[in-house]
Each structure stands twice: as structure tokens, then as C-alpha cells.
Amino acid sequence: MGSAQLLSDVAIVGCGPVGALLANLLGQEGLAVDIFDREREIYPLPRAVHFDGEVMRIFQAAGLADRIAAAGRPSSKGMHFVNAEGRTLMVRRGIDGLGPHGWAGNWYFHQPELERILRAGLTRFPNVRTHLGHDIGSVDELDARYVVGCDGARSLVRRAIGSRPVDLGLHQPWLVVDLICDPNAPRVLALPDYSVQLCDPARPMTIVNVGTAPGGVRRRWEIMLMPGDDPARVVEPALFWPMINRWLGPEDARPERAAVYTFHSVVQEGWRKGRLLLAGDSCHQTPPFLGQGMCAGLRDAANLAWKLAAVVKGSAQDTLLDSYESERLPHVRTFIELAVRLGAVLQETDREAARARDRRFEAGAEMFDYPQPQLGPGCRVDAPPPVGTIFPQPRLGDGRLMDEAIGQRFAVVGEAPLLDGLRTDAVLLPGVGLNWLSLHGKRAAVLRPDRYVFAVASDRAELVDAVVALPVRPG
């Protein structure tokens, strides 16, 4: 490949959801992007099925939220962990109405359709070139200023970096069965409309209400493999139907796919080496018990995109990219460690230990929410939360969502007198976010392009200091 053909600002290896989103975000910023994928076609069967309200907000930043919302199913329901007798042990709360990010808090979707929307979004940008059916043999082939590996758990780019894996302790094979169900069948109608984690020591399972599908409704069963199960044969209908016949049978649904996956919990140390960077499964993997695997990769893309744009455009030093791993690794590790703890509750197969587990919840179900961790140290003021957490997205007086008024820029929100006459190229939004600021005992906040809080201020002097401390020249 000649440099005249492929010289670009950023080359992305992998055109799955993470790579395609990153290419959309960089394309918006006018960067020259080449994105590669070894497969010519989108994988036609479902894999990830859930994302949260923060991720929908990221899709909004990419200008694709309305199309993705039309293709997905918003849900106000949570996730229930129940024991073998059906008693609820734990509940991840749902969110009624709009969540703090201006969208429903949970969404279910069909991954091939999501990928089609993301790839179609790339056609908006003449500065983004897509190379499908193109297998990269070495990163040395890529004549680009930066290379981002969004190429999954067997990442070529990660091997070139030499990242070090950190094992977080969970590795377990599960069977994943997607069914297209008759929406009028009585047994289908009787299924819960929320996700269920069945903590049955005889056979732990997960049941997910995904949404509508051609010819019916899609439901997913994830079934833990037990000693004696043959992974090569358990995918056969004759073997998996008996596992789920207490809910459905062949007369109620047809299998769309059955496959065995080993769920892993691992993070990599070393997300960057020179021009090489990682995002998504190439630098972390989580079991699906919190529904946050794809979400984590898309957060990577949102964090990395504005930093790459700032560096390439010359408004920030290259060292800004070092903050990517330092911020994201502890953040994603919080989610993975919670998923591992939930997996310990779900995957208990010793009957006496399961009875002891159930007794811990005799006083009532434990309620929990998604964590809201602080970013690690990096492009933010060194201060406790709410610095380093994501700012909510209110609707403005003119009807727009806040992010629509900001674009991919820094912003300052808060009390009007503090913002009046402030010398900065950041977007000023006086009177916005006052309830949030009052909750935290502050009067103003400086927001990054990914809407994480760079700094908060109690007075004008603190606000001026925060704006002066920005390592990126806003604009």
C-alpha cells in the first residue's frame, strides 16, 4: 500500500460497533480516517443486545440517535436476580421515563441493524474511507498518524503494543440461544417483560426480552454449561430445548442461533504505544451480567475521539492521549468487577452455598443501580467527585437537549453572574445545570467535549482558574 493512497490522520482496525462509532465521531471533526475490517459483510446474527442511556447520548453526539432509537426498544424495566424458587434476591433498578442523559435509561437492539446504521453514518463524510474485506497483516501496513485497534479480543494491534492482561477472575462457558417467538403464544405472553438472572444451582440462566423481530419477538436465553455438557453438542435443539421447556417449547418459537461463548473478565495494561491505541474488547472484556460490554467500548470511543481530534488539529499536545488509559481503565474496571460479583451470585452451583446465599436476602431484595464511577486521573482537575463524572443532559429553554447547543466543544454551565464576561472559547450556558450544581454545593462546572466534568467552582476565581487550566484550547 502506497502512502499516497492511504496516508490518513487515523486508521481504525475493526468496523464493529466501537470502530464504526469512532470513525463517525472523527469524521464529524473533519479528520482523514481509514477504517478496515476483514469481513466484507456485517455478521448477520445478534451478539450484544443492550446499551444504556449514556451510550444513546454518545450516539446523539454522532448524529445517529434518532435512527438508532427507531430501530431499538427503550425499556423502563430493570434486571431481577431470582433463586430457584422464584424469590427475588437482587434488582437492578429500571428508570421510568427519561433518564439523566435525556434518553431512556435502557435500550435493547439487534446488533446487525445497529451496525448498518453506524456504517451508513460513515457515508456522510468524504474524509472517511471504508475498506471492507481487507485483512490487516501488520500495523506497519497502515500509513496513518495514529492507529486504533478496535479489533476485538484477539487484537492484532494489541499484540503490536505488547499489552499486559490482568485477570479479574471469571472465565466460564455459557450457551447463548436466541429465539424468534410467536408474539401471540400464551407461554410467550406469560414471559416477564424484564431481564431475569435465574440463580438456580442446578442450571444458572439469563433470560432477556430483546424486542420485536421479523416474524415475531426476540428472546434470549443464556445458559451456563455444567460438568458433563459437551460444548460441541449442547447447541443442538434436541439438547437445549429441554433446558428451557419450563418457559417455552418448539411450538412457541424457532431458534435463530445457538452458540457457546466463554465469558471472560480481563483488562489490559498498556492501551497506547506511540501511535498505536486500543479500544473496546481489545483492551477489556466483561461477563454480560450487567449488560455493559459493548457500552464500555463505546465509552472508550467517546473518550478517545475528542482527544485525537484535538491533537491532530494542533489544539492539544500529543501527551493528552496518555490520559485515555489513565481515565478509562479504572472506570471500566469498576463495571467489570461489579459484573464479576454479580456472576458469583448467579453462578453458584453448590446447593448448600446457594441456600446460604439466599438466606442473605431473606430481609428483602437488594436494590442497586449502574455504577457512576469517577474517571481516573487525566484531563480533569485533581479533585473528588463530581469532578470526573458525567454531567446530566437537561433540555434547554428552547427545547433542545443540552449537547445539541454545545457540539463537540468544551462548555461552562452554572449561575449567570459567574459566567458573565468569562474569557473563554468554551460554550457558555448560564442558568443550565443549577439543580445538579446545588446538589453538589457548587455554582459552576466546566464540561469536556464528552460531557465529563473537568472542574467545578464555588466562585468566580475558582472558575477562572479552571478555565485557565484547560490543556486543550477550546474552539
List where the protein language model places each region.
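Conserved FAD-binding catalytic core of PHBH/FMO-like flavoproteins
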Residues: H80, A120, Y146, C150-F263
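An active-site-proximal "capping" alpha-helix that borders the catalytic cofactor pocket
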Residues: L298-V312
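Helical substrate-recognition/capping region of FAD-dependent monooxygenase/halogenase enzymes
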Residues: M1-D9, V13, Q28-E29, R38, ...
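FAD/FMN-dependent oxidoreductases across multiple families
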Residues: A71, P231-A296, F335-L338
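Glycine-rich FAD pyrophosphate-binding loop
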Residues: G27-R47
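Active-site-adjacent segment of FAD-dependent monooxygenases/related oxidoreductases
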Residues: R47, D52-G121
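N-terminal Rossmann-fold NAD(P) dinucleotide-binding loop
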Residues: G19-A20
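A conserved short coil-to-beta-strand element within the FAD-binding core of flavoproteins
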Residues: L132-E141
